[in-house]
Amino acid sequence: MPGCRISACGPGAQEGTAEPGSPPPPPREPLPSLQPPSPSPTSTPTPTKSPPLPEAAETPVEGQELQRWRQGASGGSGGAGPAGIAGAAAGAGGRALELAEARRRLLEVEGRRRLVSELESRVLQLHRVFLAAELRLAHRAESLSRLSGGVAQAELYLAAHGSRLKKGARRGRRGRPPALLASALGLGSCVPWGAGRLRRGQGPEPDSPFRRSPPRGPASPQR
């Protein structure tokens, strides 16, 4: 209402002034306090532990380092641009040079090993040749020693029997005695047909018992 006082229009005035015949107002409930409740010692919250991570989620140290290296290489190449590409090309070129140098050294070592093996084989061949030559020389020396021994024995024999050999050679040079020739010619007169041969042309030859008779045929007259 206009013109009324605040004290008369407030809630206190309304409570104090009640209409006659109306029931008494119900008791009002106290308003809840807005202050937070005091913490009790028994209701202190305990710190909760986080559940342990599974072993599969833990990555090894080497894997982490590899990932970091890959990330750094990709980031450096992506961020650097042409400079990163040039650095990578230079690194690849350096590695290629190192590989070429290692290959050259390996080829040199292989060539030296082959040369050494060839020299060893040649030395073995020369050793075999020298051994065969020594064996041949030993055989020849043995044969020469045998020949020299035979010559020495022949010289000794000649020195011991030289006079006898000279006498035998002188005796062999003499001619046959005439008595042997006469006896050989005289044998022809011992047989009856031998004398006829010596006196050919002087008379008929006597009949020889060893002369063959002519064949007897059916028409030949019998004596």
From Swiss-Prot:
GO MF annotations, alphabetized: DNA binding
Disulfide bonds: none
Single GO cellular component term: nucleus
One annotated GO biological process: regulation of cell cycle
Listed InterPro entries: TRNP1 (IPR040266)
Subcellular locations according to the entry: Nucleus
Amino acid composition bias (Pro residues), ranges on this chain: 21-54
Secretion signal, residue range per the UniProt entry: none
Domain of life: Eukaryota
Tissue expression summary: Expressed in brain and kidney (at protein level). Also detected in spleen and intestine.
Region (Disordered): 1-84, 196-223
Cited function: DNA-binding factor that regulates the expression of a subset of genes and plays a key role in tangential, radial, and lateral expansion of the brain neocortex. Regulates neural stem cells proliferation and the production of intermediate neural progenitors and basal radial glial cells affecting the process of cerebral cortex gyrification. May control the proliferation rate of cells by regulating their progression through key cell-cycle transition points.
Assembly, per entry: Interacts with TMF1; may regulate TRNP1 proteasomal degradation.
Matching PANTHER family: TMF-REGULATED NUCLEAR PROTEIN 1
Protein name in UniProt: TMF-regulated nuclear protein 1
Organism of provenance: Mus musculus (Mouse)
Lineage of the species this protein comes from: Eukaryota, Metazoa, Chordata, Craniata, Vertebrata
